[in-house]
C-alpha cells in the first residue's frame, strides 16, 4: 500500500533493542510503534523516556501493552483462585507469558509524567478471551467483533482487555522536557 501511495520513501523501519533505538536514527521521527514490548522490559519508564527522545515535537506514539487487569480477570474466570491469591507468580522463566504485565493506571501516569498527551485508549480483546464457549470466537466472529468494537473504549471493558492500546502525542510545549533524563 505504501508503494502504491508513493510514500514508501517516507518510511524507515528499525528493528533493534528498544534501549538502542536513538543511535539508529539520524533525526527525530513522526511515529513510533511500540506494541507488546513494554511488558517484557524491567525498566519501562526508561524505555518510555527513550521513545520520547526519538520523536519530533507533535509526533505520535502507538503503544500496546499486556494488561495486568486482563490477566487477573482471565485467571478469575478460569477459576485459578489459588494462583491469583499467590499474586500470579510467573511459573516458568521462559514462556510466552510476559514477565511484567502492566497496570493501566501506572502506564498512563508514566506517560503523562514524561509529558505525553494521551489522545486515546482502547481495550484489545475485551470479551474474546472470556468466552466460555471458545468455538464462539470463530463461529460468532462477526457479532463478537461488532461488540468488541462497540465497547472497547468504554469502562469497565477497556480496562479488562487482554491488551491496552494507547495513542499519545509529544506536545509541542514539552518537546524538551526529557532530554536530560535519557
Task: Indicate where each model-derived feature is located.
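Short catalytic micro-motifs in class I SAM-dependent methyltransferases
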Residues: 36-37
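Conserved class I S-adenosyl-L-methionine
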Residues: 60-87
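Short alpha-helix
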Residues: 96-121
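A C-terminal cap/extension of S-adenosyl-L-methionine-dependent methyltransferases
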Residues: 120-174
Amino acid at each position: 500500500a505504501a508503494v502504491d501511495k508513493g510514500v514508501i520513501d517516507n518510511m524507515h523501519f528499525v528493528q533493534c533493542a528498544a534501549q538502542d533505538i536513538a543511535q539508529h536514527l539520524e533525526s527525530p521521527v513522526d511515529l513510533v510503534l511500540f506494541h507488546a514490548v513494554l511488558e517484557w522490559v524491567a525498566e519501562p519508564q526508561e524505555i518510555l523516556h527513550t521513545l520520547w527522545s526519538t520523536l519530533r515535537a507533535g509526533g505520535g506514539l502507538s503503544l500496546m501493552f499486556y494488561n495486568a487487569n486482563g490477566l487477573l480477570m482471565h485467571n478469575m474466570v478460569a477459576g485459578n483462585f489459588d494462583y491469583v491469591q499467590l499474586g500470579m507468580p510467573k511459573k516458568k522463566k521462559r514462556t510466552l507469558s510476559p514477565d511484567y504485565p502492566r497496570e493501566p493506571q501506572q502506564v498512563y501516569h508514566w506517560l503523562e509524567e514524561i509529558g505525553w498527551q494521551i489522545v486515546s485508549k482502547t481495550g484489545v480483546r475485551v470479551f474474546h478471551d472470556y468466552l466460555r464457549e471458545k468455538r464462539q470466537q470463530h463461529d460468532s466472529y462477526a457479532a463478537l467483533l461488532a461488540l468488541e468494537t462497540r465497547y472497547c473504549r468504554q469502562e469497565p471493558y477497556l480496562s479488562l482487555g487482554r491488551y491496552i492500546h494507547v495513542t499519545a502525542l509529544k506536545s509541542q510545549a514539552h518537546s524538551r522536557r526529557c532530554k536530560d533524563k535519557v
